[in-house]
Amino acid sequence: MWLYTFAVALIVIAQEINGEPHTRPSSATPLNATLPPQEEGSAQNTTDAAVGSRLSTILRDLPTIKNISIFICVLTTLLITCLVIKICRSARKIRKTRKYDIITTPAERVEMAPLNEENDEEDDSTLFDVKYR
């Protein structure tokens, strides 16, 4: 939801940078309207004008579209960079996993002990809770 709000705010800001928001002229004729035979040539001109007005609208808004596209590309690049940095940092932190074995003693006491005792340089204070069912 915050992304949608951010996108709307960005569009509003971009419109304010380029000036007042422009309203598009309605060049469409009603669907049930009939043209007299002498106006058939002007119907072709109306269609050309409608296409021309759409293109002029796109061309008028081209700087805004360009600014939004550049912003989205920069944001995507930043996100990808952050993910790559996070992956590189986590790859450095991966340590050799210690494997544990179950040692059973009388009176149902169970404890965990490392299998390889030669790597006891670290003070390992991991506690294991065993629950009996």
UniProtKB/Swiss-Prot annotation:
Record keywords: Cell membrane, Glycoprotein, Golgi apparatus, Membrane, Signal, Transmembrane, Transmembrane helix
Cytoplasmic-side positions: 89-133
GO process annotations (BP): Golgi organization
Keyword Signal among UniProt keywords: yes
Signal sequence annotation: 1-19
Membrane topology listed for this record: Single-pass type I membrane protein
Side of membrane Extracellular, spans: 20-67
Chain ranges passing through the membrane: 68-88
Pfam entry (one): DUF1180
CC terms in the record's Gene Ontology section: Golgi apparatus; plasma membrane
Compositional bias segments (type: Acidic residues): 117-126
Record's subcellular location: Cell membrane; Golgi apparatus
Glycosylated residues, chain numbering: 32, 45, 67
Coiled coil: none
Region of interest called Disordered, as start-end residue ranges on this chain: 22-47, 113-133
Function: Essential for Golgi structural integrity.
Homology family: Belongs to the FAM174 family.
PANTHER family in UniProt: EXPRESSED PROTEIN (PTHR28607), MEMBRANE PROTEIN FAM174B (PTHR28607:SF3)
Protein name, UniProt field: Membrane protein FAM174B
Species whose genome carries this gene: Danio rerio
Gene field: Fam174b
